[in-house]
A protein has these predicted regions:
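A transmembrane-helix-recognition feature enriched in membrane-embedded lipid enzymes
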Residues: 1-60, 107-111
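Residue-level preference for the first positions of well-ordered beta-strands
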Residues: 69-71, 138-144, 172, 214
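A membrane-cytosol interface segment of integral membrane proteins
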Residues: 114-135, 140
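Soluble extracytoplasmic domains of inner/organellar membrane proteins
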Residues: 131-132, 138-141, 145-163
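Cytosolic-facing loops and C-terminal tails of multi-pass membrane proteins
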Residues: 235, 242-268
Length: 268
């Protein structure tokens, strides 16, 4: 059964990846020929949702995403956080530079408008400037303030240096919580940690039955240049942590619509 599931999902994933690459090339060609700039956000959101379906995710969401540009902050468990969260609302990501060098995936991430940062390179100031510029242009940006992925059972302390971009751009911050469950417990396959390689992790994910993914969009937090970011950062981390606990306890419901919202992949 695992072999059938893997073969089916891998075929779907590869086929959808090919369609996504074709779409990205088409948009790039149109921009080049007509010397125009196409908003890729709606296309990226469709593609991210497609990836989540191919991975077999069953998603439930709670809360309302901001209708205005905001700086999203979230806990970070896996590379799959990106298609999950990117499928919820149009946004751009801040990602480590290594992702940009991944075959096909890296190129697609670049075409989707991902902002890449060199870890440990002392270029946080440049990243802050790029985030501020993107927010000021009317686009939301998602950052992972933990600075690394975790096993998904807790939330590490948040780094505050990139959160200054929200104050610089005059936008709010909206915390998000994401969690993966399998059989009612934190999933041990979803975390992308240590020296794991993308292709090996992907195969393991595709081989196993569908995983439940919970996302909580918490109320926005307003800051300005007079705000004590150290306190705000601690509060944001606690909010995200409490949300993760709620997801792990299976107490997720869509308060806005009165029921859970599910996006299911193939039942394999």
């Amino acid at each position: 059964m695992e072999l059938i599931r893997l073969t089916t999902r891998l075929t779907l994933f590869a086929g959808f990846l090919g369609l996504t690459a074709t779409l990205a090339c088409t948009l790039l060609l149109v921009e080049t020929l007509f010397r125009c700039q196409i908003d890729r956000a709606p296309f990226a959101r469709i593609c991210f949702n497609g990836v989540s379906r191919c991975l077999g995710f069953r998603m439930s969401t709670q809360g309302a995403f901001s209708e205005r540009p905001v700086l999203y902050v979230s806990n970070h468990i896996s590379w799959s956080d990106i298609p999950v969260l990117g499928g919820q609302v149009p946004l751009r990501f801040l990602s480590k530079a290594e992702v940009g060098r991944w075959p096909v995936i890296g190129w697609l991430a670049t075409q989707a408008g991902t902002l890449f940062i060199q870890r440990g390179s002392g270029k946080a100031g440049q990243a802050r400037h790029e985030i501020t510029s993107t927010l000021s242009s009317g686009q939301s940006v998602l950052v992972f303030p933990e600075g690394t992925t975790t096993a998904g059972v807790t939330v590490l302390p948040f780094h505050s240096r990139l959160l200054h971009a929200a104050a610089d751009a005059g936008v709010d911050i909206q915390p998000l919580s994401i969690g993966y469950l399998r059989n009612g417990h934190p999933d041990h396959l979803a975390p992308f940690i240590g020296e794991d390689e993308f292709q090996h992790h992907l195969i393991r994910m595709l081989r196993k039955p569908a995983v439940e993914v919970g996302v909580i969009a918490h109320p926005v937090v307003t800051i300005d240049n007079t705000t004590d970011l150290a306190d705000v950062t601690r509060d944001l981390r606690q909010t995200v942590h409490d949300g993760l606990r709620q997801i792990q306890a299976g107490r997720l419901s869509d308060q806005a619509s009165g029921g859970p919202t599910a996006v299911a992949g193939p039942e394999l």
